[in-house]
Amino acid sequence: MKSRKILAILLIIALMIPFTMILGACQAKSSVIKIAMLPKFKGENYFDAAKNGAEEAIAELNKEKKVAEFLYDGPPQDQATNQKQVDILEGWIAQKVNVIIVSPNDPTAIAETLKKAQKNGIKVLTYDADAQTDARDLFVNQVVSAGVAQGLLEGAAKILKEKGYGPDATANIACVSSAKTDANQQAWLSEIRNLLKTPEYSWMVIKDENSDVYYPGPDETTTQTQCGTLISRMGAGDDKIQAAIGLTSMATPALGSQFQSASVKPDINEIAITGLATPNAIKAYIKDDTNPLKTGVLWNVMDLGYLAVQCGYQMATGSITSSSASVNAGRLGERKIVDKMVVLGPALVFDKSDIDKYNY
């Protein structure tokens, strides 16, 4: 009788062991934080660089053991719409990811889907471009808008002054943006307009908002076409444009390219080109003495992706919240959190003298 009891106990233990192993495996699996990153579109060097930084952060988090899993998807450039982003987000919500990091194409239209993710317990962060503040938990901002505008106008003003423009010689400027719904470009344009009213930059003028601010959207072909049109309008004289400023990482290289390929080029001694771009995208133009693109403005894009993942992981694990005072962002050190926003750092202005220092 006693031996039967012992046998029964051993049988129960034997049956429990596989169950315990399965349960432990499930618990281990559930402890892995799934972080999903959604750019405005895929296949462009700016967002590719941010992805590289994000993957670096994931590798760093998984150094001792696997604690984070990285998912990455986005619409192609020629389909960079809110609906395409929403379709991807819906899939991630169904997969029950822990963190979504998104650069919205339309900050208002995407809000409903982001709120749905939040209701499902997903931490929502924006990077590069913001959404409505009530539709995300944290905005990982690359640089404050005023800093971007300052860097762009400083770069343009420096080149123009070398060509004889200044307080006594007005220069007409034009900007190439993206879509009118893009929150970043609208914020930067607003700051540029404000700075143009100050004594330091009052000699630089956007004469006509309708004709001198271009909105090609995210399509590369349209961007190239409109940049070509702008290049054809540049030159000396009050009826011409003296400075072209690219407000996207697609527009600025397009301006350099369109000048280079123009059959009839404006006088390089009368014009200036600058704008936002990754250094590698405009390095050839900046180093070319026959091209008027002489300065670029950006931030460390890889660090932006890295910072976004660090913040997302710590929000998912409860190490920080939207109301925390700061975040310890790995190799980037401590970054302050103010009004549900963390800022990477100041704008980076580069030219021929230092562009080789940057490889992205």
Language-model regions, residue ranges each:
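Flexible loop/hinge segments that line or gate small-molecule binding clefts
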Residues: I110-G147, K163-V176, N280-K287, L293
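Extracytoplasmic "Venus flytrap"
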Residues: K34-L61, L71-V86, S103-P107, A179-Q186, ...
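Short, solvent-exposed amphipathic alpha-helices that sit
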Residues: D48-K65, V148-L152, A183-M204, T222-Q226, ...
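Short, low-complexity disordered leader/linker segments with a strong preference
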Residues: M1-K34, I93-A94, K115-N120, D356-K357
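Hydrophobic alpha-helical
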Residues: A94, V99-K119, I192, D212-Y285
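Short beta-strand elements in bilobed, periplasmic/extracellular small-molecule ligand-binding domains
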Residues: E60-D78, K197-E220
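Hydrophobic alpha-helical segments within soluble ligand-binding/sensing domains
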Residues: Q85, V140-A171, A187, E220-C227, ...
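Hinge/cleft segment of the Venus flytrap/periplasmic-binding protein
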Residues: A169-N184, N300-V301, G305-Y360
